[in-house]
Amino acid sequence: MSEAQTVSSEPGIVRDLTAFQHNILVILSEEPMYGLAIKRQLEEYYGTEVNHGRLYPNLDDLVEMGLVEKSELDKRTNQYALTEEGYQALLDQLSWTFSKVVTDEERAADLEELIGAAR
């Protein structure tokens, strides 16, 4: 897969996530959500419709990997929440990205500015 990225959520454990799956984890880092809310946020990000046939199998894969927890809200609606392992996978990915991007003080300042703006 061309979208694949490798992240390690624990020493010795390697997770292969697509960019789409990574984006789901990022969305769930805000708060637990049901599937259609995740779908809407992905559509906003991508600027195009996200097919149910793409979303739900990816959510199921993330649940199977232990990065997302699935719970039943009612008979028809499931809620998805980021697990501690999923959160750690996001931190590991950010750490790796920052280690490659931050090559001098100016770039470090740029990232500090981004982080400050997000607060």
PLM feature segments, named:
Residues 1-3, 23, 119:
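Long, compositionally biased intrinsically disordered regions
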Residues 1-14:
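Short, Lys/Arg-enriched N-terminal segment that forms or immediately precedes the first helix
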Residues 12-51:
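N-terminal helix-turn-helix DNA-binding core of bacterial DNA-binding proteins
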Residues 20, 54-58, 78:
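Short, conserved alpha-helical segments within structured domains
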Residues 75-94:
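Basic, amphipathic "hinge/linker" alpha-helix immediately C-terminal to the N-terminal HTH DNA-binding motif
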